């Protein structure tokens, strides 16, 4: 009975994560032993609802450059794959070559942008780099209901806010998405707006205005670093937090009963088989 209770707890914890597997985890492990990681992509077709949209797209492209190395590092540290390989390429060329279309999933607070991929383009990349699947991370603009607090944590304003959200997927050579990260509520990567509680307070106004964060403020947020162990403090905080979350979710053998340890992924024999 105690064993069954522990199993139920672990299953419930698995359902609380931001990402989810669209096939059984055992099947995922068998199909994706070597994972390819693309540069961070930016969806410039999704409106940011910000007056400086063009400058923000440029800022994201500039700050994203090379950051996928940190994600590869996080994934390798988890030891959930036989190998994790970086895939080179120009981010915008990759986006327009790979992405066949997008649609909105969920609703309200859980809405997110879902992407479909061109199977031939995916196959060319997986064959060329000898990987079983691609991890595609797309930064995109989305407006959805969020609850934002003032600095005292005593007041909040729930409204529609624009933000940079993250949609991620593991795609097989056939174009099938077998793992998805749907940007869960409260996980916005970079808020683009804020409620001005101070203005309302000093003007003795009941209405709280929603204002746009400046490009300079967004750049500071993307570049913010904190002290840390093992040299991690030199990395931008927002990116490190995102990659740690993604790597933690992308472990097909994460949820083990106490006393059990996950087996190391078996190396592929000969050339890697594809589904």
Model-inferred region functions:
Residues 40-42, 138-144:
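Generic short beta-strand segments
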Residues 12-15:
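C-terminal motif of bacterial Sec signal peptides marking the signal peptidase cleavage site
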Residues 49-141, 171-191, 195-197:
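N-terminal segment of the mature soluble domain
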Residues 20-21, 56, 115-122, 149-156:
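N-terminal post-signal-peptidase region of extra-cytosolic proteins
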Residues 17-36, 45, 144-147, 158-165, ...:
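C-terminal/domain-edge helix-coil "capping" segments
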Residues 38-58, 102, 221-227:
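Acidic/histidine-rich, surface-exposed loop or edge segments in extracytoplasmic proteins
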Residues 2-9:
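Sec-dependent signal peptide recognition
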